[in-house]
C-alpha cells in the first residue's frame, strides 16, 4: 500500500521560505536554546516571582495549544515513499513541523522575554489578530424613530387646542358669524365655541366671503380636513358656516351635500341643520333609505310644466341611497353643488369601493353642452391653473372632511382628489429629529376627550357577563353603553341581562329596523333604558346625551374602533369612564395597541371574587333561562 506524505502548515513565514528539513531543524535548535536560557533565568528569580512566572507559563502554553489547533491544515503531497521506513520518517517529519510552527509563532516576543527577565510570560505571548470584525464591542445606542415623509399640509397642520373646558372662545369674539345665527346659538344654550369650532368656522367663512358663486379672488378655495376627538363639536363647525353662506341664496338648488356612513348619524346631522335653518328660507332633505324612494323623491324635486324644480338646499345622505337618487330620480341635479361634506371621513374612504365619490363629482361637473340651460354658469372639471382657465370664473366645489381618526396615509387621501388641502388637527405635526425627543410621551396617534378615564379589567370568559352586570349595578349609572363585536354576542348578552333582572336593558343592532333603532335611541336618551347593548353601529358619531359609562364587552380589534367606542362618553367637556374586559391572551396586544393610540393612562381595575359572589346565584338562574330561550329561538328559525 502506498503511503502519502502529509506536510504540516508551519505558518506564513515558513510557507514563504520553504519547508525543508534543514531549516526546520535549525529553527527548532534555536528555539530550544532560548527556552533553556529562559528556564535557567527563572530558577534564579525569587520564590514569589517564580510562582507567578510558572502560572503564567502554564496559561501561555494552554493558549498556544488553543491557537495551534485551528491553524493545522492537512495537505496531501503527490509523491509516495515505497520503503518500509516511511511511517517512521513521517512521524519525525510531523514532530519537526510542529516544533517549527512553535518557533514561527512569535520569535520576536520570545527574544524580548529573554532580554527582560522580569517580564510576565502572559504578556509575552500575544494573540493573533482576529480574521474578521468582532461584534459586541460597541455601546448600544437608542435608534432614532424614523419619521414618515408626508406632504407639507399633513406634516405641518394648523394645530388646535384639545381642552373643551378651558380653551373656549366666546361667540362675540368671532364677529364674522351672522347675528341671526349668534342669536340662534344663544337660544340653544351655546355661549362659547369649542377650540375646533373657533378655528374652522372663520376659515370656512373666509372661503365664502364673496358669496358661494365664486371663491376668494375668483380662485378655487382650499379643501379642509379636520381631525379632532369625539365630542369636540365638529358637526357645528360645518353647520354654522354652510348655513351662513347660503342665507342669501335666491333660487333653490342643492348647494350643500353631507355624506355620512350610517342612517342614525345622518338623522343626527339633519336634526342640527334643521335647528339652525328653522328661521331661514333654507330647506334640508334627509336621504337615508328609511322612507321609500318615491317619498324621498318628493322631498327633493317637483315636476313642473317647464321641467323640474329643486326643493332642497342641503341634502344629508348615506352613500348607497345617494347613488340611487343620482341614477333613478329625474331632475336630481348636483350641478350647483358648492360644499361636499364628508363626515366620519376615514370610514367613508374605506367604503370607496362603492364608487359613490366619483359619481358625485361627475354629477357636480356634468355639462349639458353649449346649448343647455344656464350654459354660462356651467363648470368644467378642475385643471391646471393657467391664465386661460381663470378668464371664466366658475362656482367651485369645496370638500370638507371631518373625523376623529382621520388617516394620514397619502395614498388613501389621494382618492379624494383634494385641492390644496389644509389640515386642522389636535395632534402635533411632524417634528424635526431634534424636537422628537422633546415631544410629550402621551402625544400618540389619536387624541381623546380630556374628561375620559380608561380602565381595563382582566377576567375569564365565563365571568364577563357577570362583570358587566356588576359594573352597571355598583356604579348606579343612568346610561351605560356596552359594545360587542358581533350581533350574536349582543343578542345573547341582552337576553342574559334581561333574565337576570334589576336592570332596564335594550339591544341596538342591525337585527332591528331603522324605525325600531330610532325608538330605542330616543328611550335611551330619555333615561328609560339603563343599559344599551350594541354592536359598533352606534360607535360612529352618535351623540347620546348623558352616557356615563362605556363597557367594551369584547375587546376591539382595531385602534380606530376603540377610539370611536369610548368617544360616546365624556362628550362636550363632560366626564366619563370606559372599561374594557380582557382575557389573559388579549392583554398584551391590547395594551400595546392603546399605548400607540396616546391613551394618557390605562388603569388596571381588578374586581375581587367576593364582590361578584352575591350575584352568582341569580346569574346561574339567568344562564339556565338563557339556554331555554336560545333553544326556543332556534326552533322558531327552523320552523
From Swiss-Prot:
Q: An example Gene Ontology cellular component term from the record?
A: nucleolus
- Domain Helicase C-terminal, by residue range, is 467-615
What keywords is this UniProt entry annotated with? Acetylation, ATP-binding, Helicase, Hydrolase, Nucleotide-binding, Nucleus, Phosphoprotein, Ribosome biogenesis, RNA-binding, rRNA processing
The record's annotation in SMART domains points to:
DEXDc, HELICc
Keyword Amino-acid biosynthesis assigned to the entry: answer is no
Q: Name one Pfam family in it.
A: Helicase_C
Location comes to: Nucleus, Nucleolus
Concerning PROSITE patterns, the annotation shows: DEAD_ATP_HELICASE (PS00039), HELICASE_ATP_BIND_1 (PS51192), HELICASE_CTER (PS51194)
Basic and acidic residues bias: start-end ranges: 24-48, 94-105
Biased-composition ranges, Low complexity, are 50-63
Which enzyme class, named as a word? hydrolase
Q: Where is the short sequence motif Q motif located?
A: 193-201
Q: Which residues carry this modification: Phosphoserine?
A: 79, 432
What are the boundaries of the region Disordered? 1-131
Q: Where is this motif: DEAD box?
A: 343-346
Keyword Disulfide bond (UniProt): no
InterPro entries reported in the protein's UniProt record: DEAD/DEAH_box_helicase_dom, Helicase_ATP-bd, Helicase_C-like, P-loop_NTPase, RNA-helicase_DEAD-box_CS
What SUPFAM superfamilies has UniProt attached to this entry? Answer: P-loop containing nucleoside triphosphate hydrolases (SSF52540)
What function does this protein fulfil?
ATP-binding RNA helicase involved in the biogenesis of 60S ribosomal subunits.
What is the protein named? ATP-dependent RNA helicase DDX51
Name the gene that codes for it.
Ddx51
